[in-house]
Curated annotation (Swiss-Prot):
Modification sites for Phosphoserine: S2
Gene this protein is translated from: Dctpp1
Residues where substrate binds: H38, W47, E48, Q49, F50, H51, W73, Y102
Top-level taxon of origin: Eukaryota
CDD domains, sorted: NTP-PPase_RS21-C6_like
Gene3D superfamilies in UniProt: MazG-like
Listed name of the protein: dCTP pyrophosphatase 1
Molecular function GO terms recorded: dCTP diphosphatase activity; identical protein binding; magnesium ion binding; nucleoside triphosphate diphosphatase activity; pyrimidine deoxyribonucleotide binding; pyrophosphatase activity
Chain segments carrying region Disordered: 1-25, 150-170
Catalytic activity: dCTP + H2O = dCMP + diphosphate + H(+)
Example of a GO cellular component annotation carried by this entry: cytosol
Influence of temperature on activity: Optimum temperature is 60 degrees Celsius.
Amino acid sequence: MSTAGDGERGTVGQEDSAAARPFRFSPEPTLEDIRRLHAEFAAERDWEQFHQPRNLLLALVGEVGELAELFQWKSDTEPGPQAWPPKERAALQEELSDVLIYLVALAARCHVDLPQAVISKMDTNRQRYPVHLSRGSACKYTDLPRGTISENQAVGAGDPASELRDQAST
């Protein structure tokens, strides 16, 4: 569980009052630990023969479907998953775990280093979605208004500090 000033770490049955604090994952297990645990689990059962990329992907999609069912038909006005009853929270934890396990297994089978791939993808996303064009917008990067305003104009609109910078640069 969390320590003072550590932020919330998620577990089933956590009280709703903790939802106001920032959420943080536990430092362990790492993705490599999860890959190893699943590989050992599959090897003990001689299941590697069934873990071709296609099969892992279909299993992943099935688990995403089970996760989606937990949210299906819930009203947008209902409290979020943080306030669900313990039985529903436990189901949420299990389905999210299944999704992660299959995602890690698929990445391992395809030799994709997920942590490095995430770093690379975030760099790509930063280029596709510059803050000054995408802040507060749900538009896809191909629909963003490229070249219509400068970064200083967008970020600094109404900001006294940016107005001082603009004046100093003229």
